Curated annotation (Swiss-Prot):
Top EC class of this enzyme: transferase
GO terms of biological process kind: riboflavin biosynthetic process
Binding residues for (2S)-2-hydroxy-3-oxobutyl phosphate: 73-74, 116
Protein name per Swiss-Prot or TrEMBL: 6,7-dimethyl-8-ribityllumazine synthase
Gene behind this protein: ribH
Pathway: Cofactor biosynthesis; riboflavin biosynthesis; riboflavin from 2-hydroxy-3-oxobutyl phosphate and 5-amino-6-(D-ribitylamino)uracil: step 1/2
Annotated binding of 5-amino-6-(D-ribitylamino)uracil, by residue: 12, 44-46, 68-70, 101
Length: 135
């Protein structure tokens, strides 16, 4: 069975999320998974609604989130990631389907974000493994 993935990709820090998305797509192909749909959202905080829309479609087996939250002058980055992660978990449980967290941050610099591009690959791996193990 080919695992059908939905991607939700943040446009904020697009120079980094673009590279994350490319790596995620390549790894999905390596794992013989299909990226059936992709929704682009402004930022990580905006992901839950797009995730829900993908999960409502019966053909999507799992959702992979791709985002990058870089530290700023305030604690805004921590709030964004904490609330996004909490809602992502809630949606996974509500729909009974894996939603993999491919959001790097908070508390990282742009250089650290560049070094963590492989978080997207890890999220794809997690999503595919969870679908296979929950069959």
């Amino acid at each position: 069975m080919t695992v059908k993935l939905g991607f939700v990709v943040a446009e904020f820090n697009r120079d980094i999320t673009y590279m994350m998305e490319i790596e995620a797509r390549e790894h999905a192909g390596f794992l013989d998974a299909e990226v059936a749909d992709t929704i682009y959202v402004p930022g990580a905080y905006d992901m839950p609604l797009a995730i829900k829309k993908l999960l409502e479609r019966g053909e999507i087996d799992a959702v992979v989130t791709i985002g990058c939250v870089i530290e700023g002058a305030t604690q805004h980055d921590e709030i964004v990631v904490q609330h996004a992660a909490r809602k992502i978990i809630d949606l996974s449980l509500e729909f009974g389907k894996p939603v993999a967290l491919g959001i790097s941050g908070p508390g990282m610099t742009r250089m650290e974000a560049t070094e963590r591009i492989d978080y997207a690959k890890r999220a794809v791996e997690s999503a595919v493994k969870m679908v296979q193990r929950l069959e």
